[in-house]
Amino acid sequence: MGSNQRIVITPGEPAGIGPDLVAALAQQAWPVELVICADPALLTARAQQLGLPLRLHSYRPEQPATPRPAGELTVLAIDTPAPVAAGELNVANSHYVVETLARACDSCLNGEFAALLTGPVHKGVINDGGLPFSGHTEYFAQRSGRERVVMMLATESLRVALATTHLPLLAVPGAVTRQSLDEVITILVHDLQQQFGIAQPCIYVCGLNPHAGEGGHMGREEIEVITPALDTLRAKGYNLVGPLPADTLFQPKYLQQADAVLAMYHDQGLPVLKYQGFGRAVNITLGLPFIRTSVDHGTALELAGSGQAEAGSIKTALNIAIDMIKHRNE
């Protein structure tokens, strides 16, 4: 995997299940050093609340990466300014959440870490704290100086990328342009090759409108925007199928041929994927200068500290990040 064997993890909202999931990760050994960017007192208290053993080591960037045995983690300490109670949001800690994201992102940009894994944040309380925040994907893109990144969610058998992300449905048609599709598909194909080891990815592309526009009778975006964009990329050797109606495309006989599906908007593609693999799916940001994976669920405040939070998604996200590091280093 190379000399850089550290993955930084941000637990996210301190009152949510993020700290629980980190404590769960610590219960097994991993082939990389996990560095948790968080308040060590928070991690210790939550592990004690859950009855899980946890020993913390201070992060020392000058020392070689050291994978820890079960029950131990490395922590890059950032303290919460206000007390944390499991399940109870506190707007006073919203700046802390963003500070952990900034520190982790900057440390990936300077090469300290091979990948970043994010736990769930609560966007509402961050915005209530006076920090405009629409999501991890947009935040990391802006901080990394990338104008275009791609959100992709993945299960063991399905990958769904999005042409647009957190936009009102009314704004989607205007955001789907020939240029935007060219940029999104170029990033998608490049990262499937470089980070997933797929030499010639086959991408199935959804139409925007019902029945993919029905020959222009239900919208003309497929004729005037999507098909011309795909034809231009096909001429460069890209393996693209579509645009196809989404309700046709998301059938097993089509999906088994696809390395990834490109949906035009958030709620076109993600309900299918989450129905198939909720709790086991992973959110991946493509197009960043570093590897970033995330859980596919929210903060689940009602489960924080209860011992009932499922760690399947964060474990899958960590395993995928490790695999992506291997492919990138090949």
UniProtKB/Swiss-Prot annotation:
Binding sites annotated in the UniProt record for a divalent metal cation: 166, 211, 266
InterPro entries: PdxA (IPR037510), PdxA_fam (IPR005255)
Domain of life: Bacteria
Record's keyword annotation contains Disulfide bond: no
UniProt keyword Cytoplasm present: yes
Amino-acid positions noted as binding substrate in the UniProt annotation, renumbered to this chain: 136-137, 274, 283, 292
Cofactor note (record): Binds 1 divalent metal cation per subunit. Can use ions such as Zn(2+), Mg(2+) or Co(2+).
Pfam families: PdxA (PF04166)
Gene Ontology cellular component list: cytoplasm
Stretch forming the signal peptide: none
Cofactor or coenzyme needed: Zn(2+); Mg(2+); Co(2+)
Catalysed reactions, semicolon-separated: 4-(phosphooxy)-L-threonine + NAD(+) = 3-amino-2-oxopropyl phosphate + CO2 + NADH
NCBIfam families named in the record: pdxA (TIGR00557)
Classification via HAMAP family: PdxA
Name under which the protein is recorded: 4-hydroxythreonine-4-phosphate dehydrogenase
Native species: Sodalis glossinidius (strain morsitans)
